[in-house]
Amino acid sequence: MISRSEPSLIKQWFGSPQRDLLSGLVVAFAMIPEAIAFSGIAGVDPQVGLFGAFCLSVTIALVGGRMAMITSATGSTALLMTGLVATGNGIEEGLGLSYLMAAGLLTGLFQILWGYLRLAYQMRFVPQGVLSGFVNALALLILQAQFPQLGLNFHYGENHAIDHVAQILPIGWLQISQVWGLVVLGLLIIYGLPRLTRLVPSQLVAIIILTLISVGLSLDIPTVKSLGDLPQGLPTFSFPFGSVADGKVPFNLETFGLVLPTALAISLVGLMETFLTQDILDDVTDTTSNKNVEARGQGIANMVSSLFGGMAGCALVGQSVMNTENGGRTRLSTLFSGVSLLLMIVWGRTYIQDIPMAALVAVMITIAVSTADTSGLRNLAKIPRSDTAVMLMTFAVTMLTTPHNLALGVLAGVALAGILFSRKVAKVINVSVKEVNDEELRYEVSGQLFFVSKVYFLQGFDIHEHPNKITIDMSRAHIWDQSGVAALNQVIRKFRLGGSEVQVVGLNQESLDLFERIGGGTEPNPI
């Protein structure tokens, strides 16, 4: 049975404190490697992702619309940051981070606006083909971002963060072979351990074992420390706007124009992944949650994160499901995951900085695999060709844009889905003709009359035949837009020019009101 009422404040926080605290602690362990890895994808120091994970989790626990959902730095949002960070660093070394913080603030403002505009209602109409193309493109991009650590240093462009990672992680063939060996071992642990026990996250076990091997054998391979410094204390307030000499970005229209595309893309892609996660948790827990409240909460969380040196993010599907499977049900689990993460990175930074990048690569490969819509790919030959076309369009546009733009891919997929759906609906309209007597013809119209179907509608009338009287029966049809009105208007006008008396009958009230508003003065004479 689905609960429709909002739980009391006490139940939202303290419904099952023991399970929530334990689950939050386990989730924090799983968040650390991903936050560090996503920082590398975005081209910033690990502490940016870690501070973001802390700020986002704590804030969303307070103002979010879905209990027990985990919000942190994510692959989908990190991939959208790469171009902006690299461009900012190109303007002035180190300035990319300030541009990223400015984009995070604007992202938050957009998401608060989307929440008040009830964007969640519109996102319900995103078809499955678009979602499939989105997650498959995301999976491939996450996998592609691991290439530098594996020695696959393809050139992606002057302002691409993957090239930035390749520059700061130069490794030779000996190190590459060691990295590949550790990655394979890590994958074996991650996929093999759950067959034996699920008491601890297999990703965490893999990281610990690979770190012990790397340190014990004194392997000369890249580690987390290679990417940058880990935080030594709590995040501090920092406003991104100011003097360039102070490492800030100027508060002007040029800065706004630079960060606007990234902020807009992150706000939309982040909410799409968040709403998807929200639907999954609603289904798992047999509850409902408010997506518009969640959208505003995500916006507030991203603004707080950006003001305290963290990157923007969104809900994490994997960690959110992990939290609920471990018994997390209230806001306390989300809050404690963020607090635990911060305590671990501040007190355990000496150990975390020795984690080999190979361990994070193994983790990210498993994330890429779990992100991909493998069932959709397996059933590619069975699903309708229109759905396949939408999925491929979303995937292709994302992969072919530079930098890779998930938001643009989604928009392209939605546009194609709309066109294909319109074509299907257009063919449903039908016009049949009956000869009442020698002096009268009766046309019966059924279906939806709008801008796409008007061609099929017009083809149903023989305007060269002019009996004394023509009746157009619209009782089983509906006019949706100006194009539909214009099409009916055109038929009436041409028959009347030929000398026929035209009468339109059966228009429903909505169609009649629309015709009377924009019919151009032609009276349909409905009865």
Locations of regions flagged by a protein language model:
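The feature marks cytosolic C-terminal regulatory regions of anion transporters and related permeases
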Residues: F241, S370-E523, I527
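Transmembrane helical cores of multi-pass ion-transport proteins
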Residues: M1-L420, K424-I429
